[in-house]
Amino acid sequence: MNEKNLKPASVFYYFEEICQVPRPSKREEKIIAYLKAFGREHDLETKTDEVGNVLIKKPATPGKENLKTVILQSHIDMVCEKNSDVEHDFLIDPIETVVDGEWLKAKGTTLGADNGIGVATELAILAATDIEHGPLECLFTVDEETGLTGAFALKPGFMTGDILINLDSEDEGELFIGCAGGANTTAEFTYQPVSAPQDYFYFRVAVKGLTGGHSGDDINKGRANANKLLNRFLTQLASKYILYLCEIDGGNLHNAIPREAQALCAVPMKDKESVRVDLNIYTAELENEYAATEPNLRTELSSESPCKEAIDMTTAGHLLRAVYAVHNGVYAMSQDIPGLVETSSNLASIKQVEGNKIKIVTSQRSSILSSRKDMSEMIRSAFLLGGAEVTTGEGYPGWKPNTDSPVLKVAVDSYKKLFGVEPKVKAIHAGLECGLFLEKYPSLDMVSFGPTLRGVHSPDERMLIPTVDKFWRHLLDVLVNIPTK
C-alpha cells in the first residue's frame, strides 16, 4: 500500500498487510497466527482464548499511567463475496486493493475493511512509539459476521479495561452508543403430500424486483417484503378458488429483507383467466402502495406442467393464514432517540425442507430485551395457532444507549475541537458485539466509531480514504483525553 501513498501511512501499511492474510469467518487461523506473531515481535503481552479471540496489551506511555485502561476492539473475520466472473479463493488468495478516486476498493471481491480497517488501526497504535495513550488492551474477536462466536465466548476476566471503543462503525463523524439485540424465531409446518389433480391449471407466480436491504438498518424505510406480498396474493386465491399449493420459496438470509418469492400452484381450469386478472389487479394495488419505495416491483405468472403431489389443503391454509398474521417490519420506535427503531421483526425466509416440512425463519430485533422477547412471543403465538412447531433461538443482547457516557463526552468534545462541527450521536437497529461485551462486563463504558464504508458484504465494498485520516486523528485525540482512574 505504500506505493499508493495513502494517509495515515501506518494504518494503510497494516491494512495492506492483513489483506495478504486470508480470514473468512470461521477460518481465522491464519490471521490469529499473524496477530500472535505481531505481539511477540513487538514484545507485547499477548493471549488467546479457546475460540481464538486475541488480546494484546500495551503499557501506558510515560505520564499517562493514571488514565483508565482502554480496550480497542475489532473483529478479524470478513465476509467473502466475489463477482461471478472473478477467480478468487478466499482461503488462500490475498485481497487485491485498488484506488478509485477517493475510494479504496478490491478487484471484484469484498475489501474486508469491515472490519479490517479497525484491526489495522489497532496494530498501528500497538506498533507506534510516538503516540501518547494510557494503558491499552487491543481485543480482536473471531466470527462476528456469521455467529458473533468470539463475543459470545468471551469470558469475564479476559479483559481488564474500563472503557471499550469499538472500531466497527461505517460512517465517519457519527458516534454510536447503542444497538439492537436480536433472535430468530423459526416455525416448521409438517404437511401430508396429496395427489395433485392433473386436469387443473398449474402456474408459477413470483414477486420480484424488490429493493430488499438489511433487516436492521433498512427495516424502517417502507420497503416491501416479498414473502408477505406473495402470501397475500395466495391467500386471496385460496379464498376464491380451490387452490392447490405445490411449492413455495422466498428469501434467504435471516438478516436480509427478502427481495423475491415464488410459488407453484394449481386452480381449476375454468378459473385460469380469472387468476391472471386477479394478479393484474393485485399488481396495480402494490404499485400504488409502494410507489415511493419499490419502483422496480413486478409480478410474474407462467404456466407449468402438472405436479404429482401438493401440500395438503389443511396445512396449506394454516400456513397462509399464519404467515399473513405474523408481524413484519417496525413494531415500536425508541422513546429515547428520535428516529431510532426500537423493535422490529423480519419474515426472512420460507423454504421447503426434507421430511415434508416448510421452514419459516423470522428475525426479531430490539434495543430492549423484554420488548424483543415480547415480539418473539407474538410471532411464536401466530405460528402455534397455525399448528406449527416453533423455536426461538438464544439470541444476542442489545446495547441500551447511555447518553451520559463519560467516553461519549470525550469523543464529542474531541471531534468538535478537531473539526469544528458536532458529531452525530446515534444508535443503530442492527447488531454489534457491544451488547455481548456489556453482558459479560456490565461496568464497561462504550462508544463505537470508524471511517466511512459503503457496499459492505458485497464486491462493491469500498472505503472513503480521506475519512480514515479523520478517524485516526479523532481516535488518537480521544486516547489522550481519557479520564483518570
Predicted features and spans:
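Midchain, well-structured core segments that form catalytic/ion-binding scaffolds
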Residues: 22, 102-105, 145-146, 152-365
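His/Asp/Glu-rich mid-to-C-terminal helical/loop segments that flank catalytic regions of hydrolases
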Residues: 222-240, 270-272, 317-324, 332-335, ...
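Acidic/His- and Gly-rich active-site-bordering loop/insert found
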Residues: 2-103
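Active-site-adjacent substrate-binding region
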Residues: 218, 225-227, 232-248, 393, ...
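Substrate-recognition/cap regions that form aromatic- and gly/pro-loop-enriched pockets
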Residues: 340-430
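Acidic, glycine-rich active-site loops and adjacent beta-strand->loop/helix elements
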Residues: 76-78, 139-147, 169-172, 211, ...
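Zn-dependent metallopeptidase/amidohydrolase metal-coordination segment
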Residues: 7-11, 335, 342-355, 363, ...
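Active-site metal-coordination/substrate-binding segment of hydrolases
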Residues: 64-146, 151-162, 184, 313-316, ...
